[in-house]
Amino acid sequence: MGRNKSKYYKRTLHQQAYDKLQGMIAFGESKTNAKKNGTTGNKIYSKSTYQTYKKHINYFVKYIMKTHPEVKSMKKAKKYVAEWLELRVAEGCSAWTINLEAAALNKFYEIAPDNPKRFQCPRRNRVDIKRSRGQKEQDKHFSKLTNEELIHFCQACGFRRNVLERLRGDDLYDRQRVEQCLLQARKEHDMSMIKACEDALHFFSDQEYFILHRKDKGGKTRLAPIIGPYKESVIHRMKNTTPDALVWNYVNSNCDMHGYRADYATYLYKLYARPIELLDYKKKILCADGKLRSEIYVCRSDEKGKKLDRKAIRAVSVALGHNREDTAITSYIRNL
């Protein structure tokens, strides 16, 4: 036992962290089923989540090595998690960054939400968001005139970069194809495609064309409607791209994808929002989490008192690939 323990501590903290993270990988497994079984605590289901958590855990490891060189195991480093996160708050990191780093360490150390020692992160307020707000340094290196078609394409479809860079001509779906795809997915028990098709047909019953967002954030697949004044030019480009060819061979790295997703979300909300005066606060609708809530969403924080159509918010969330309605409101829907 002593020799094995000695051998363990010869590994650096980085090696110990890497080994632990490798053991948590569950790529390709169903997170939905794991949630039902209550076994998601020590698993990471997405490659992008793994890479993000790995990066932020390495920041923590570097801090431990610098400030607590006597610590030789990740197990003993656990007691410094709160100290590290408090330092990050003092350094002026955004609430989003703090929440992300806390999520990474909570997952790594399996710190449950009801654990009294779990770090209490600062609230994330819409007014504090800096991403895609105002002029940024990268905007100086991006010509809106030269990239006009790319911008319009993004505003009509709400892409994340990873999906746009992999988009093929075959990813255009008309309503008939969605219906056929749903039948095929049911035969093959392809649950992700079944949900994508059912959501498209249910939430966007008046739309004719959709883009397949294949294996987006979290490995999710969805069909989002093509909307807005540039809809026809998007459909034309898709139809004139051969099925296996990339629609865009190059996507400028300075393109503000998040900002154009916000344009898409805002346009979509306005398209589906009903006049608030026609809605009834007492009328309940079923939300994504299975709970019944008023069809009127009342904003908080800096927009306290503003009322929005919860049904339209739900449609926007589905199109963006988010489950939580507050994400659509806080990060995307603007200037209403």
Predicted regions and their residues:
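N-terminal core-binding DNA-recognition domain of tyrosine recombinases/integrases
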Residues: G2-R3, A26-N125
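DNA breakage-rejoining catalytic core of tyrosine-based enzymes
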Residues: F119-L145, G218-P229, T242-P243
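Basic, Lys/Arg- and aromatic-enriched nucleic-acid-binding interface segment
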Residues: G134-L167, C299-R300, K307-I313
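Short, charged phosphate-coordinating catalytic segments
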Residues: C154-F204
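Short, basic/aromatic-rich helical patch in the C-terminal catalytic core of site-specific tyrosine
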Residues: L164, H258-A273, V316-S317
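Short functional hotspots where side chains directly engage DNA or cofactors
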Residues: E179-Q180, F210-H213, K291-L336
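Intrinsically disordered, low-complexity domain-flanking/linker segments in eukaryotic proteins
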Residues: Q180-K195, D280-E303
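C-terminal catalytic core of Y-nucleophile DNA break-rejoin enzymes
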Residues: K215-H236, D244-Y264
